[in-house]
Amino acid sequence: MMKNPNDIGFIHDISSLDSLRQKAVKEGKDGEQEALHAAARQFESIFTSMMLKSMREANEGFESNIMNSQNEKFYRQMLDEQMASELSANGSMGLADMIVAQLTAGQGNDKSETAMRDAANSAVEYRRVDPKKAREIEKRLIESGELSRTSHTPAKFDSPESFVNSMKPYAEKAAKALGVEPSLLLAQAALETGWGQKVVQNARGSSNNLFNIKADRSWQGDKVTTQTLEFHDNTPVKETAAFRSYSNYQDSFNDYVRFLNDNPRYETALQQRGDSESFIRGIHRAGYATDPTYADKVLQVKQKIESM
């Protein structure tokens, strides 16, 4: 069955264009118009993705090393691709409408001229955007609800310090229950979420999952499915996985403590909880994360937090 033509889906799903062509041939004029609109939105999503890529490249010189790793760039690329797809699906840029209006203007339809004029005005608004303001645009799209809630989207934390200050009370409580340093939990949450900027989102907003704990068979609560990066034989691979969703950040910290205490594979690591380095390397070896440098990264972030 053909996908809903109003659903742009994943930006690189170019094979769907052949389905649009077949639909146009089989269903006559109505199918042709429907396919035209869908193809225009596909083109707009690709154009928008290219524009966002240019913005990111223009802004690279202003980014710190800790927020500009390969993992960060990978998730940022996924965010931009999904943003481009969603903006096109919602008609937010107006480029698709302008394309359709131009291609149908010869039919003498006054509505086409109006749509073309409105779309042109909308497109001009975006062409005037300064590439250096990419982050501000991204934030505004999230606040206005234009950005997909199923993607990794920035949260309210505007700096590493604000993330640490907000999470510190929860981390201290969880660290006491677990018997580890609060700074270690803060570091792990910071690494997993990019200082709170990449918390997995669900239909209601944030999943509040600070430790990216997946929703396995034992999980009976809410969950959200999204793309993630896993390492196989030290090679990063994009995968789709279900993650746990919580009502608030406190629940996320509480579940992290339960997750480690109730899982036998972390028993050896928990016996070394008095030594932060041994503990984080222990849960890493036990399979908490597939990134081969995960423990080293957590410890580096921990040092940064302790120097704040």
From Swiss-Prot:
Organism name: Vibrio parahaemolyticus serotype O3:K6 (strain RIMD 2210633)
Keyword Cell wall biogenesis/degradation applies: yes
Protein name: Peptidoglycan hydrolase FlgJ
Any GO BP: bacterial-type flagellum assembly
Places the protein is found: Periplasm
Gene: flgJ
Region (Catalytic): 159-308
Primary residence: periplasm
Keywords on record: Bacterial flagellum biogenesis, Cell wall biogenesis/degradation, Glycosidase, Hydrolase, Periplasm
